[in-house]
Regions:
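Nucleic-acid endo/exonuclease domains
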Residues: 1-175
Length: 175
């Protein structure tokens, strides 16, 4: 038996409980967005063609979009270069769009909470518009958590398509 959608969301947030700014920003986005049709994943594993593994802070698979929260460690010179390479590799592997939210300003001071909240508001507008765009192009499939891992829908249809973002709990379900 799979966990309930509520349990899934709580487990997802628990993955980032020790990253205080990431937790604040991501939970604020999800709570203010308040869209049960949008699947989201915290710390989404992304594997590149050369087997490198990266974690995206917040991923919206159906919108082909992921977010990175730039905390202070991202401001160091050595991180800036590796972040650019990481972004390129993730985009090459997924063809997703990356968006970033920085918690620090150009002087490496933590931004005022009001300023961070305004950036989050812009992110939410972007997400809403992206969903509208995908709906208008008939590219959006609403998140159906209760049926996400059930193979019956795909068996009836008779095929799997990578664009459908299909997931199964067991290997046997894909066979």
């Amino acid at each position: 038996m799979t966990a309930s959608k509520g349990e899934y969301i709580l487990r997802t947030f628990s993955k980032i409980q020790h990253k205080k700014w990431e937790l604040y920003i991501i939970t604020r986005i999800i709570h203010l967005l308040d869209d049960p049709e949008l699947e989201f994943v915290c710390q989404q594993l992304i594997k590149t063609s050369d087997e490198k593994r990266y974690l995206a802070d917040l991923c919206f698979p159906e919108l082909e979009l992921y977010f990175e929260v730039d905390e202070l460690q991202h401001s160091k010179i050595e991180h800036l270069s590796s972040d650019k390479n990481r972004m390129k590799e993730i985009i090459d592997a997924t063809n997703f769009t990356e968006k970033r939210i920085s918690i620090y300003d150009q002087n490496l001071k933590i931004k005022d909470l009001h300023q961070i909240n305004r950036e989050i508001d812009l992110v939410i507008k972007f997400l809403i518009n992206r969903k509208k765009e995908y709906l208008s192009k008939n590219k959006f499939n609403a998140w159906d958590y209760n049926n996400k891992y059930k193979p019956d829908i795909h068996i009836k249809r008779g095929y799997l398509d990578i664009k459908d973002n299909v997931s199964f709990l067991y290997h046997r379900d894909a066979l």
